[in-house]
Structure formats: C-alpha cells, structure tokens
C-alpha cells in the first residue's frame, strides 16, 4: 500500500512540475492570436472568452497540438525515434502563422532543456541532439509528450494536463487583455472541466486524417498579430 501510494504521489509531483506556470520557458509571452481577437472586439466579455476557449479546445487543439502530443506519446512508448522526427516535421507544416510556429518550438526547446537534467532517457538525448543539428525544431507538444512518458506518466493524465495548461494560459491572457475579473476567469476554468475530459477522449487515439484541421479564424488572427500597432504578447 505504501509503495503504491508513494508511486502515485511521485507521479503527481512530476505532473505538477511539468505544468508549473512558473517554469522559465516563456509561455506567458504568447497569446497565439487571442490578442488580435480582443483588439477587434470579437472576444470582449466573459461569455465570448469562454466560447473562444471551448472552440480552441474542441475544434482546434484536439486535431493539432493535442493530437500530435498523443501520437508522440505512443512513439515514445514504442521507442520510435524516426516517428518522433516525422511528427515534428508534420507539426511544423500545420503551424501556418509564423509567430505561433516559432513560439511553439521555443517553448519546446526550453522545456526539454529543463527536464533533460532530471530524466535520463535515450530518446530525450537523441531528440536534443537532433534539435542542435537542425534536423527537428522541437515543438512544445512533442517535447511535452516525450518528457511525460519518460517520467512514467499515463497518456490520459498527460493529455489532460496539457489541455488544462493550455486553457489556463488562454484564460489568464484573456482576463488581462479584455480585462475581466479574476473570478470570471475561475468561473470559466470551472466550466471547462467536462470539456477537458471530452478533449482527452477525442484525442486519445487520434484519426490521422484529421491532423492539422484548422480553425481558420484563429490562424488568420495569429498572422494579423504580426502587424498589430500595439501589443503585449509575442504571438
């Protein structure tokens, strides 16, 4: 019993560390198009911010970052390094907005730099070498999956943590940009509990025919963000 409990708590600690908002990777610098939506008054209230997060979660992330994370986790389980590289290349092709694309691999490289110091795994070492040699970019969802699997976390927990972390980031940025009260942000996060579980279920075994399915409005706003006159975020 004690051994099982200790393992469970160790896994929980690893998961909490992986989604710690204070990790020095720069995630708070990126809105991925949300800032444009706010400036255009498309997202301007608690209701519209919640609708935006729900749309991102169930119409964007499950076919893009979440799906690639799911497939990368499987590739780690199989020890398939070539597959991990292939997923990195594919994800690069689907990220059409330059700022979002660059932001993702910058976050991934920084995340790997932190956790490779704690997790000994041949594929993490090989992937870091491939990044240094410019053979892969090191996108955040791929690295997140690799680190989580190396920690011994389950795929379901990893997906939930990834979506939760992404949702919290959007809500935090939205509360700041619109602006809204902190309690409004907490209400939105509470309302997302069921949707987060649904997202995990929908992307646990992703249909590769749907990889890269786009929310065009978000991609356009992410590209428009590059030329905003004033902005708080890098993407």
From Swiss-Prot:
GO cellular component, as recorded: cytoplasm
Membrane-spanning intervals of the chain: none
Signal peptide span: none
Localization of this protein: Cytoplasm
Pfam families: UreF (PF01730)
Recorded GO MF terms: nickel cation binding
Keywords: Chaperone, Cytoplasm, Nickel insertion
Cited function: Required for maturation of urease via the functional incorporation of the urease nickel metallocenter.
Quaternary organization: UreD, UreF and UreG form a complex that acts as a GTP-hydrolysis-dependent molecular chaperone, activating the urease apoprotein by helping to assemble the nickel containing metallocenter of UreC. The UreE protein probably delivers the nickel.
Similarity comment: Belongs to the UreF family.
Full protein name: Urease accessory protein UreF
Gene: ureF
